[in-house]
Amino acid sequence: MSLSRCILGLACLWHGVIASPLGAVPSNIPIATDLQTAAETVAQPIANSARKLHGKFLHITDLHPDQFYKPHSSTDEADACHRGKGPAGVYGAEVSDCDSPFALINATFDWIAANVKDDIDFVIWTGDTARHDSDEGVPRNADQVLGTNRWIADKMAELFSDSTGRHLEIPIVPTLGNNDILPHNILLPGPNSWLQHYTHIWRRFVPEAQRHSFQFGGWFYVEVIPNRLAIFSLNTLYFFDRNAGTDGCASPSEPGYKQMEWLRIQLHIMRERGMKAILMGHVPPARTDSKKLWDENCWQKYSLWLRQYRDVVVSGVFGHMNIDHFFIHDERDINVGQLAGLADNSIDIREAMDDELSVTGAADYLRELRQNWAKLQPPPTDSKNSGQLKKGKKGRKGKKKKPDVWGERYSLSLVSPSIVPNYYPALRIVEYNISGLEDTPVWRDAAKDAMSIELEQNDRQKHLDLKRQHPSHMEDDDEIDAQKKKGKKHKGGDSKPKKPDFLIPHPPAKSSPPGPAYSPQPLTLTGYTQYFANLTHINNITTEASSALLDHDEEEETWVDWLLRWRKGRHGNRKPIHPKPDPREFQFEVEYSTFNDKLYKLRDLTVKNYVELAYRISKQPKKGKAKSIDVSYESAAEEEEEEEEEEEEDLFEEVEETDEEEEQEDDDLSDGEEVDDDSDEDELETETFKKHDKKKHKKKKGKKRQNKVWMHFLTHAFVSTVEKEDLKKFT
């Protein structure tokens, strides 16, 4: 048997028996064992289809429809927009903890039908299609959770079906959210009743050839452009640190482990077939120095897979967090020794991130991200670091390392804001490069094929035989090897740790060009347009001003209370003046577009550009005054200094200080520098506030410098719901 066939035989590995909640023994997951079979099991293209690729797709997430929502109800926590009198709008209570009224869902689908439907190639739908369990008076039940999911699935199918209503015109790729099950966050290993229900609800979306795989663990993929691009729907609930029903990705008996093995095998097959992949899921692999959303072992494997299959993976796309942002995976955070069992992984100082981020929690999280971004090393460009491009760095044994021109040390994950109006409802249209693909045969809604039935009858013993035949291969890449050795820590004696049964995927061939995540080419993400619905304008609510209440609040309220008050919505909980709702016409409008955003300056969505953006967001004003330059002598150092000065002008702006002197201990996330002509002291100033509207010590107004790209990023993170002056309080 050839080595390539042995490698492909890995498709049958690690799909052993998992006990279901009812004690039933599931069948093995059918996975293609050779390239021909894999190609035959996908939806076949229509040779003469009139439909062409547009180079766009829709990402929609966290709809949270709530059948109990009532307009003009109270936004208090005890009422949750279900009862009482208050400012809940017809289309939702913006900037609150209330869920989405059906009116918002219907209006969103109407807008998509009128403005988006005919211009996109596929839909990525990243879960949470049931309301939160936030009202003790109306607890959730399975019928409600499944009912709203079924309703939205039917609306999706109806919207994107052909004139007969029997076939989808474009593929829709859903995934499970942590609120799409009961109790929320907890999903036991499959097969189970939840996966069985969603197999039926999503029968139009999950390819028949992978139906059994989905029933087994809730993961699958769709070739949205046959033989060119696949969307992988990951069941991130098995990676989620708050899922008490499973235990991460370390043990072969865990569904998280099995899913990672499935993903590794499928990405290998994608590489062999010359295909690319977008990875999507609900819970993102968010991770800072103190917080995390995924189990650490799952995060480590996922990051390693991204690195080793960087020629295949285009990007990661996620939801859940409601805030618009991104994060960057650094290969130097990968601990292969830990994954291989050569290092202690029992100590992890990172705490599980809050299930639902408050404004304060989100601000803290974004500040930590910014701290991490300050450590990034942007890839060299023609105008900067030209010396690094030519010389390179000396690596192990004195060998010169090639400069990382494309930023392949890093990987990218994008997180979109939500439909549920925790801020403003939002959705995203992402564009990708279709150069040379304009006439490519497109996806079609395929009927059940005989091949899927045949795959389901694969013999379990054959899987085990293939597993035994495949030789363990450990990656010999210098950097991976160094990290492995770094993880080896055994004390005393001549005993050596047992060789682990851990397979590290092969990286791209050294002769391979950078993938679409790094170098502009077909299937590279070129940009996106972020849309939002300004519910403050659309709901058109005027509320009563209760001066007595406001005076009391302003006198007693701390800054923490002020931030938490946002969760009651834009209007607090004041009653509307007009008894009957009078909303304006519902519309989504452009919040920003990466194609023309003058501060983000993203030429496309390649990793290199995002690393540069993250680094610019992290920059702090320099202490001291700029040194004068002798124009009579131009050296490389002076040119570099001039470039730095231009960058300073580009990144920072002078703003008036507030009348109030804010007190806070020094930290690394200071965003302002005092500009005082009468003093030589130039210290970075940090901002906070001790009490929201209490009297404070007054000081003479001055000017400070702040990073306008960071402020711009924060504005979009909260979907333009927070005024600039208030954003300063978060920084």
Swiss-Prot record:
Biased composition (Pro residues): 505-519
Biased composition annotated in UniProt, kind: Basic and acidic residues: 457-474, 492-501
Chain ranges passing through the membrane: 5-25
Keyword Transmembrane attributed: yes
Keyword terms: Glycoprotein, Hydrolase, Membrane, Signal-anchor, Transmembrane, Transmembrane helix, Vacuole
Biased composition, class Basic residues, residue ranges: 390-402, 691-706
Main localization of the protein described in the UniProt heading: membrane
GO process annotations (BP): polyphosphate catabolic process
Topology within the bilayer: Single-pass type II membrane protein
Subcellular location: Vacuole membrane
PTM text: Processing by proteases in the vacuole may be required for activation.
Biased composition (Acidic residues): 636-686
Cystine crosslinks: none
Protein family (similarity comment): Belongs to the endopolyphosphatase PPN1 family.
Protein name: Endopolyphosphatase
